[in-house]
Amino acid sequence: MRPGTRRRSEPRSEKLSEQIARQVLHDIEDQKLTPGTQLPAESAMCERFNVGKASVREAMRILEINGLISIRTGSGGGPVVGSTDGRGYGSMSTLHFQSMGATLRDLMNARTALEPILAAQAAAQPGTEAGEALRASLECSLHVSRTDSLRFASSNSDFHAVLYSVSGNPILALMARALRDIWSVRVESVMLPEGERHEVESAHKRITDAVEQHDSQEAERQVREHLEFYREFCEENYPHILSDVVEWW
C-alpha cells in the first residue's frame, strides 16, 4: 500500500516522504507503541510503501527532527519510537521562538500564564492520584540538600513535571514540559541561593496541599505566586539572561 491510500483524509497535497512520516505516526498511535519500540527497517518500509530509500530516509528525518523517533546506530540499530517527554517539541519550538526574537523573559511569562491553569486542573481531578503523585515528588525533593544547587534545581523541575502530568490535559502538559525544558538549558546560570530555596519548598508544600484538597482556586493562586516569586528573583539578579533571545537547541 502506498502511503497516500490510507482512509484518513489528508489536509493538503504531500510529498511522499511526508505521507510516509504521517503513516508511521499513525502506526505508532494505532498500535500504542511505547518509547524505545523498534520500528520496521528501512528495507521493509521501502517494500511496504513501494518507494525508494531516499523517500524513507527523508520521512525518518522529519520524524527524528521533531523528536518523534530516534535513530539507533550499530548492530540492531534503526528507527525507534521517541520519548514523549516534551524535549522534541521543545527543540522544534525554539526554532520558531528564535526566529521571532522571543526572549527568556517571554518564556518565563508564558510559564507564569500556563502553569497555574494546569495546577487548577490537577486539583479538579477526581480521586487521590494527583495529590499522591505530587506528595511523593515533594517528599523526594525534601531529601535533597539545599546546598547542592544542581540537584535542588533538578528536584524542583521534577516537581513541576509531575504537576503537569497529573493535570489531565496532555496538550497543555506537553507545552508546559517544553517550556520547562527550554528554560532548563540555562538552569546552571540561574540558581536560587540557599536562603530562597526554603521558600520554594514551602510553595511546593502549599501547592501539594491545595491539589490534595481539590481546591482549584488555591492551587492556581499558589502556582502563580510561586512563579511570580521566581520571575521577580530573576529580574533582580539576572535581567541580562532574561533579555537573551531563546536559541535553537
Q: Residue spans of the language-model regions?
A:
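C-terminal effector-binding regulatory domain of bacterial HTH transcription factors
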Residues: 2-7, 217-249
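Conserved amphipathic alpha-helical segments that form helical-bundle/coiled-coil interaction surfaces
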Residues: 107-189, 200-208, 218-233
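Short linear motifs at protein or domain termini
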Residues: 1-113, 120, 124, 241-242, ...
